[in-house]
Amino acid sequence: LMLGGLAAWFSALTLAREGYQLALTGEKPSCDINPFFSCGDVMQTWQATVFFETPNQLFGIGGYAVVAVIGASLMAGATLNRLFWLLTTAGLFAAYAWLMWMFYHAVFVIGFLCLYCMVVWAVHIAIWWVFVPWALKAGIFGSNPKLVKSGARWLPYSWILIIINYAVIGLSILIQFPLLFSI
């Protein structure tokens, strides 16, 4: 959680800084590298400011700082109660749903990819698909033996869920942008 939180936090911070420069001076973001990868074009859409007209990356800065702190706390030996984990699960799920919504819009509606956004997608996908089986195994969703056993069974194989999620995104990008690798 700590390393993933820091990687996503840094990407969100970079997007926020470059989005600010784009709005202030019109300076092209560093991730505008070709006709397909254009963070600047993505940042100028309504999808980039969904909640309260606040840039999405500001939510990422706050959210991933929390994720990194949770990871650091666990590494330091903290034990957190079930309510905390339920709220963490709700936050991670909301972020996952939001990021997959943003992925869909970037690929199929906006028509541009954002490299830093893709880093956040990749990191959060890994966090989510490891966290869910861990939470099941830890009894966060209740002590139903079937849920606990299911989590214990899936946790060592959570990488499969991550690969499937990455494959769906990768195939969607290849289908939607068939000329992407011909540049």
PLM region descriptions:
Residues 1-183:
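Membrane-interfacial helix-loop segments of redox and metal-homeostasis proteins
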